[in-house]
């Protein structure tokens, strides 16, 4: 049974078999099962159509669905039938967003909101610490909404809700000239990277998902024959400025008998698939139509006005049926066996660039895109193993705690380099009957950066039963309103009730994360969640690729620890094993830098792009002066750019000090720590790799 058939059977109970077929239908490719309603509706929600830039959407619609005509304001119109009655069925494509309002001398962007509309009270906050795209005349440019580093905000009082004045944008530039070279100009639209469509169990989601599904219904109905009279289908512009596009289109039509508009509703307690109401004399209804009112059709949605607004597929079908009815279509050609929706092209993928950083960026991306909340490190451990050179892969061992260890060289004067495999995230603590999943944090993070974003629940290996999913998609449930920045509790929802979740194997202790996709930022920068410590792991791998183990003069231990973010648990276990014999330990981890206009530079100031960093002082250890001088001399002798600084936080190597082991932290400067958009400079990571190699082979 296809997903559409499963969902359209309104009110039917989903058995475990139906749930599993639902999950696997949505994860298989179109070549396996054909495209699903998820696929079609996701594309409609993903359309970029900022106010004034709706052509980005209408170009695609006209290319894939012939028969539309575009007017001077960008409205699309398609007519079916003739005579009376004359009906208009309309839906607006644009949705609220941001535009570049300032480009600073340092290459940062400031924003202005564009248009109006019903958005969530935490709308601005949902963008903080998230991936963005700048829509330029030459295409999309990746960017991030900046956020204060978690490590540098300790012991500060409760923060107020984020507002537009708090939003800064980092595009990987260091000057206005850099911004210009990226093709960014004043007033360019700025959108959330993943506000476009995505799907989870029985739902599609994204910014204004309900209205976008309504637009898909209008476009689908526009391809059908009406039974009597004439129906004019409109996909309009400038909704965010009072439906100016709709008003202009209606003026061009003269007298009509009926106007139906698919739009948002202020009522969030709807019990039916959609609400239908008559609106008397709206400002955008011209007298020339001869009407005093219009009909507004509002789809039922969850989490209205947020970036994770969700509409069920069954409600989407009901909405389409009602649009057809109001359009005068009594015998639609579409079949309920296959998805009925008009198709659109897939959004263009960002091309990987080829330059002197490609190899480093490629390895880093593979590691950073792995999901491994503290205590669930299997995925990142496998990614590290795959990236190791053959000699290290052969020598690699996983201990009983999950640490990955590589030993090489003669058995004397051992030196250890240690990075960690885990990342901050969440674990399930309770599953309510209604499907709401309570979570606890794993590691130090700001829950506000996850609230109102996509959620992924990860099942733990071993995966012996191929009939069960490995991941479930859902949402981090947003508060309906707030006066403080941080939520008191974190909850996720995956589109299923508690019994269905448990039938799929959801239990307390499973990891939950947001989605992520690492990417280049500007000419030399890189952004991802979990650069702490996938960047350290990458530097260690790159150094290992340069090492010839047969030429080593002493024992070299390369280690990747587990559960660092939750108390150095893996490192403590390794300290018990190696502490009595190892002479030096170098922990490879982030130097949380204050190189950001959001931070004070009196502390932790190590600018990005100026080299690797020695963590001379942090919360857990201090570098011995003689060892610090030795490292600086080695770096100078090999022209490795190296900085020294003091920051907050602690690292794996600090636990070895109690055994009498010399410990120094080796780092790269990083911005926006423990957020979804950590940023580094690839030049610094390459300098760190060279430093690790130099120390590994030093006498």
Each language-model region and where it sits:
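N-terminal hydrophobic/helix-forming segments and targeting peptides
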Residues: 6-18, 23-699
């Amino acid at each position: 049974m296809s997903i559409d058939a499963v969902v359209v059977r309104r009110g039917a109970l989903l058995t475990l078999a139906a749930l599993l077929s639902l999950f696997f239908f949505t994860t298989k490719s179109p070549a396996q099962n054909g495209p699903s309603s998820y696929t079609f509706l996701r594309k409609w929600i993903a359309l970029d159509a900022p106010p004034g830039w709706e052509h980005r959407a209408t170009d695609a619609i006209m290319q894939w669905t012939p028969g539309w005509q575009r007017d001077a304001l960008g409205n699309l119109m398609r007519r079916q039938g003739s005579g009376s009655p004359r009906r208009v069925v309309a839906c607006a494509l644009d949705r609220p967003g941001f535009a570049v309002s300032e480009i600073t001398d340092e290459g940062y962007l400031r924003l202005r909101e564009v248009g109006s509309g019903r958005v969530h009270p935490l709308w601005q906050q949902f963008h903080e610490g998230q991936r963005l795209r700048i829509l330029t005349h030459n295409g999309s440019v990746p960017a991030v909404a900046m956020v204060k580093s978690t490590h540098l905000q300790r012991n500060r009082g409760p923060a107020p809700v984020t507002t537009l004045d708090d939003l800064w944008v980092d595009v990987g530039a260091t000057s206005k000239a850099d911004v210009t070279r990226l093709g960014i100009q004043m007033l360019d639209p700025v959108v959330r990277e993943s506000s476009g469509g995505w799907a989870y169990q029985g739902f599609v989601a994204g910014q204004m998902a309900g209205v976008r599904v309504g637009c898909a219904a209008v476009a689908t109905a526009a391809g059908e024959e009406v039974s009597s009279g004439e129906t004019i289908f409109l996909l309009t512009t400038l909704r965010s400025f009072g439906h100016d596009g709709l008003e202009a289109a209606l003026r061009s039509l003269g007298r009509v008998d009926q106007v139906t508009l698919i739009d948002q509703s202020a009522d969030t307690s709807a019990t039916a698939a959609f609400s239908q109401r008559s609106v008397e004399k709206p400002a955008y209804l011209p007298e020339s139509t001869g009407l005093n009112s219009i009909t507004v059709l509002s789809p039922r949605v969850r989490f209205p006005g947020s970036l994770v607004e969700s509409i069920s597929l069954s409600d989407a079908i009901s909405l389409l049926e009602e649009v057809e009815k109001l359009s005068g279509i009594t015998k639609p050609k579409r079949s309920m066996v296959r998805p009925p929706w008009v198709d659109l092209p897939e959004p263009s993928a960002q091309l990987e660039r080829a330059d002197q950083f490609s190899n480093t960026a490629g390895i880093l991306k593979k590691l950073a895109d792995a999901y491994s909340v503290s205590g669930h490190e299997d995925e990142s451990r496998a990614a590290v193993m795959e990236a190791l050179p053959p000699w290290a892969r052969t020598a690699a061992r996983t201990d009983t705690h999950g640490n990955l260890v590589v030993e090489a060289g003669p058995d004397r004067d051992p030196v250890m380099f240690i990075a960690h495999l885990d990342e901050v995230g969440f674990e399930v603590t309770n599953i309510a009957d209604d499907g709401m999943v309570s979570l606890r944090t794993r590691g130090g993070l700001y829950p506000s950066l996850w609230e109102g974003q996509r959620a992924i629940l990860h099942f733990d290996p071993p995966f012996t039963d191929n009939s069960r999913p490995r991941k479930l998609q859902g949402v981090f449930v947003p508060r309906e309103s707030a006066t403080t920045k941080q939520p008191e509790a974190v909850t996720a929802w995956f589109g299923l009730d508690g019994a269905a979740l448990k039938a799929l194997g959801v239990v307390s202790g499973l990891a939950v994360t947001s989605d992520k996709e690492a990417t280049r930022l500007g000419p030399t920068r890189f952004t991802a969640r979990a650069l702490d410590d996938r960047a350290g792991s990458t530097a260690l791998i790159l150094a290992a690729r340069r090492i010839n183990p047969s030429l080593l003069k002493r024992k070299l231990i390369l280690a990747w620890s587990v559960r660092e973010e939750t108390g150095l648990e893996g490192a403590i276990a390794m300290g018990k094993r190696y502490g009595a014999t190892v002479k030096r330990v170098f922990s490879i981890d982030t130097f949380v830098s204050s190189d950001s206009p959001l931070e004070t530079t009196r502390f932790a100031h190590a600018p990005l792009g100026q080299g690797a960093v020695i963590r001379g002082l942090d919360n857990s250890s201090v570098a011995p002066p003689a060892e610090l001088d030795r490292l600086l001399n080695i770096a100078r002798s090999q022209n490795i750019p190296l900085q020294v600084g003091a920051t907050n936080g602690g690292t794996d190597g600090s636990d070895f000090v109690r055994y009498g082991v010399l410990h120094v932290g080796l780092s790269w400067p990083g911005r926006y720590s423990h957020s979804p958009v950590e940023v580094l400079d690839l030049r610094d990571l390459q300098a760190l790799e060279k430093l690790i190699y130099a120390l590994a082979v030093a006498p």
